[in-house]
Regions:
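A short, basic N-terminal segment
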Residues: 1-53
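Mid-core helix/loop region of P-loop NTP-binding domains shared across ATPases and GTPases
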Residues: 5-16, 22, 70, 91-208, ...
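Alpha-helix termini
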Residues: 46-51, 77-80, 159-164
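Walker A/P-loop nucleotide-binding motif
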Residues: 50-72, 92
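Residue-level recognition of the N-termini of beta-strands and the immediately preceding loop/turn
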Residues: 53-56, 83-86, 133-134, 166-169
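Conserved catalytic segments around the Walker B and adjacent sensor/switch elements
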Residues: 55-57, 79-92, 193
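Post-Walker A helix-loop "phosphate-sensing" segment adjacent to the P-loop in P-loop NTPases
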Residues: 75-84, 108-111
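Basic, amphipathic DNA-recognition helix from helix-turn-helix-like DNA-binding domains
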Residues: 273
């Protein structure tokens, strides 16, 4: 049997659900961010009665749950309401033009025609938004250039001066200094309803990783002492994501060796203390 056949034919696994450890996985239960999620939903709620929503500005370091809260809120809204939602990831849609093309794609369920100017796309978007309520989530806006961020913020927040729109904006920022580097108009707009995401505590990281392990790994694959060690390491480097990646890598490693549980020596290779 070739190595390929051996690997592909094996059904041995230590995982119940590998997807749970993916960085883009949205859990059914949001841990340690209930208050923030509730605030976002409260701000959006007026849209259900066709009233003006409160815009939300989510501020916190990387790996503090902002994206998870946004995506969880969007999922709930899509499941329980008829509101249109548009998620923009400024790591990918990293220019003003790309942001408007993403909004257009969601609103019209098709790609914009090639060759159209950003101004024409923006005009089409604004006209469409006059017809329906919409939630626009702009994640990591600090990845836009300052000029593009200034324009996007001003255009969307000031749109009611020229268009009869009923939209809710959710913006995340992981670098607070970026906010103060913008033009005064954009800065004043961002002084809206700020929702703070403090760094996770050691206990919160442990709780989140424990929940993921219970849902994603088979019983006895990792013990509490090992999980606490990974949690301490993740807390020290301020990265919950690192803990999730590490558990996934450890699981895949022992699975490839047909072992049923993680040993302390396995963790020694990745955790320096």
């Amino acid at each position: 049997m070739s190595i390929f056949d051996e690997v592909m034919s094996s059904d041995f696994t230590v995982f119940k659900n590998k997807e749970i450890f993916n960085l883009d996985y949205i859990p059914e239960i949001i841990q340690c961010r209930d208050a923030q999620l509730k605030s976002v939903l409260i701000n959006i709620k007026p849209l259900l009665d066709n009233n003006k929503a409160i815009n939300s500005i989510l501020i916190g370091n990387t790996s503090t749950g902002k994206t998870t809260v946004i995506k969880h809120a969007i999922r709930e809204i899509e499941e329980h309401t008829n509101l249109k939602t548009c998620y923009i990831n400024c790591n990918i849609q990293d220019t003003l033009r790309k942001c408007y093309f993403q909004i257009y794609r969601v609103l019209f369920d098709r790609e914009a025609r090639r060759g159209l100017s950003t101004e024409l796309i923006q005009e089409e978007v604004m006209k469409k938004l006059e017809e329906q309520s919409c939630i626009l989530a702009i994640d990591d806006i600090n990845y836009l250039s300052k000029n593009d961020a200034n324009n996007l913020i001003n255009e969307l927040f000031r749109s009611n001066e020229f268009y009869h729109l009923n939209i809710a904006l959710i913006i995340t920022i992981n670098d607070e200094t970026f906010k103060y580097s913008l033009e005064k108009n954009a800065q004043s707009i961002l002084l809206g309803h700020e929702i703070r995401f403090n760094d996770y505590t050691k206990d919160e990281i442990y709780s989140i990783l424990k929940y993921r392990c219970n849902a994603g790994l088979k019983d006895h694959v990792i013990n509490d002492e090992q999980l606490e060690r990974i949690s301490n390491y993740s807390h020290k480097i301020a990265s919950l994501r690192r803990g999730l990646i590490l558990i996934q890598v450890l699981g895949q490693t022992i699975e490839s060796e047909s072992r049923c549980k993680i040993e302390d020596e396995d963790i020694d290779k990745y955790v320096p203390y």
